[in-house]
């Protein structure tokens, strides 16, 4: 018998499934969370800086903070497709606007993606869904568990944003016949 998943791991799996189903239902994804090891590595590099910004702003602007994680995922996926060798070492500050985290969304949509029509509605919908999912968990604010759930929600939003952008760029998983 498999050991029971801890609460945070189960939350992450449930949130990922929820957002994947929601994004698939609205046509943003096709039932699969597209990813790349390079994009995942970029998240690991940017996560500490992003978490710092998001934690400071979450109480006042929770959905904005979650949306910015998705925008960051979209931007990383876009740059990965364009010329990853050129962009892979860019600092976190490259993704922030003139006012830092406060206009990160506009900076990414206007200056990197150059596509508000697709990215803004996608992230507004996903961030609202993710925030409501997080609030349904009823964790006590200020606790270690609430913080862990927040971190997981941000990470999942990054991955969903990256998957949406990869899908928009035409990437998809295909079954390959490896036989002779």
Regions found by a protein language model. Name each.
Residues 1-180:
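Intrinsic-disorder/low-complexity detector
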């Amino acid at each position: 018998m498999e050991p029971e998943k801890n609460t945070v791991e189960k939350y992450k799996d449930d949130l990922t499934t929820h957002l994947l189903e929601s994004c698939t239902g609205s046509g943003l994804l096709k039932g699969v969370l597209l990813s790349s090891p390079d994009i995942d590595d970029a998240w690991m590099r940017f996560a500490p800086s992003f978490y710092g910004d998001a934690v400071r702003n979450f109480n006042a602007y929770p959905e904005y903070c979650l949306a910015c994680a998705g925008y960051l995922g979209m931007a990383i996926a876009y740059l990965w497709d364009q010329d990853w060798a050129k962009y892979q070492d860019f600092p976190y500050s490259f993704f922030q606007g003139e006012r830092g985290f406060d206009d990160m969304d506009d900076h990414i949509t206007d200056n990197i993606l150059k596509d508000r029509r697709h990215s803004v509605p996608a992230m507004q919908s996903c961030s609202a869904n993710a925030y409501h999912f997080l609030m349904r968990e009823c964790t006590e604010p200020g606790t270690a568990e609430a913080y862990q759930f927040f971190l997981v929600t941000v990470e999942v939003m990054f991955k969903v944003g990256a998957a949406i952008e990869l899908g928009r760029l035409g990437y998809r998983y295909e079954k390959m016949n490896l036989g002779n």
